[in-house]
Amino acid sequence: MQCETIAMTPQQIALVRETFTKVVPIREQAAALFYERLFAIDPSTRSLFHGDMKSQGAKLMAALAAVVQSLDCIETMLDDLRALALRHDRYGVREEHYVSVGAALLWTLEQGLGVHFTPDVREAWARAYGVLSRGLVGALAGRGVTVVVLRQAGAHHVHRACGSACGVRGWQV
């Protein structure tokens, strides 16, 4: 089993959390913008969603909130991520869809945050989404992701969201 490493600094985690608090008050509009953009970028994703999109938007925002809160202790989400990956697989989500979702997410954040969507914020959110998407894809492919939260002067804290070859239980999400 192969593990992929994603590094985030405490500052990047803080930026994601800080800017997400600005999204929460506009979460319904942000979710609607997200899906509108996703369907424009990748029309094949439209058929993956059945039912009420407002409810789907609420689920999206709840999932983002959970990820944002868990970025510095991602191992607490392993069970949930594995379950989500398996549901996505049953719905027909393919690996390339995660690229479209990431692009739609960054665009939505840019629209919602306006001047607060700085290059540093973009990079922080891109890394946070990388943690999520690579974890979901890795869960299905038998790979894992190691999240490194960089500390000062070379010290770091490692969170592994990967299988036994990485020394941690497999994805239980």
What name fits each language-model region?
Residues 2-173:
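Globin-like tetrapyrrole-binding proteins
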